[in-house]
Amino acid sequence: MSEIIYGIHAVKALLERDPQRFLEVFILKGRDDRRLQPLIAELEAAGLVIQVASRQWLDSQVEGGVHQGIVARVREGRQYQENDLPALLESVETPFLLVLDGVTDPHNLGACLRSADAAGVHAVIVPRDRSAQLNAIAKKVASGAAENVPLIKVTNLARTLRVLQEHNVWIVGTAGEADHTLYQSKMTGPMALVMGAEGEGMRRLTREHCDELISIPMAGSVSSLNVSVATGVCLFEVVRQRGLKA
């Protein structure tokens, strides 16, 4: 099985991490871009043959996405499942997980993955049937983070949260009506941050399995933030509390 990836950051990240997955690489005919040329040189140095294509053909491959003049067909990457969780939890000293409940926009999924990678999150967990797919759009927005952060798809999110609790992971859910703010919460131990769908929030069962609910204090007239923005705010409060170093 193969899949399409596109954009300079997404292609470069996969080349650095797993060059064996590349099958074909196409670049825009006549494109002379100082950001693209070094990547082309790296691809050729890895033994890949670069093919030239028209803008119309490249556009047809990316479903309206911004390809930046480069599209690649690659072998599908590893698919993480819920049975991968125990080994992951045992492999890190202080697990830091992100759970997305009902984030169905691939742009938001990609942005959350990018923030998760920057914040040092060990894995992102999503429900199999109520989540955006990790498609080419999500990978483009993630700017390479999709190759670094495991995306674990689970059949039953509530059951997965129970498994995390059995491994002493504290479940922190976000809810606009919560009296306790993220700045009042201690988030230095093993934890999973749960973000709900924009507008709807977490589902009832997901909320019931949280150990703690927190909110983001809002000073202006807007009542909520885009889910990817809210995710970034919460993740980096955890980073601040933990004093993580680059």
From Swiss-Prot:
It comes from the Bacteria. It is found in: Cytoplasm. GO terms for cellular component: cytosol. Coiled coil: none annotated. Transmembrane segments: none annotated. Its EC number is 2.1.1.185. GO terms for molecular function: RNA binding; rRNA (guanosine-2'-O-)-methyltransferase activity. It catalyses: guanosine(2251) in 23S rRNA + S-adenosyl-L-methionine = 2'-O-methylguanosine(2251) in 23S rRNA + S-adenosyl-L-homocysteine + H(+). Keywords: Cytoplasm, Methyltransferase, rRNA processing, S-adenosyl-L-methionine, Transferase. Its main location: cytoplasm. S-adenosyl-L-methionine binds at G196, I216, L225. The keyword Methyltransferase applies. Specifically methylates the ribose of guanosine 2251 in 23S rRNA. Homodimer. PANTHER family: 23S RRNA (GUANOSINE-2'-O-)-METHYLTRANSFERASE RLMB. Belongs to the class IV-like SAM-binding methyltransferase superfamily. RNA methyltransferase TrmH family. RlmB subfamily. This is 23S rRNA (guanosine-2'-O-)-methyltransferase RlmB. The lineage of its organism: Bacteria, Pseudomonadati, Pseudomonadota, Gammaproteobacteria, Enterobacterales.
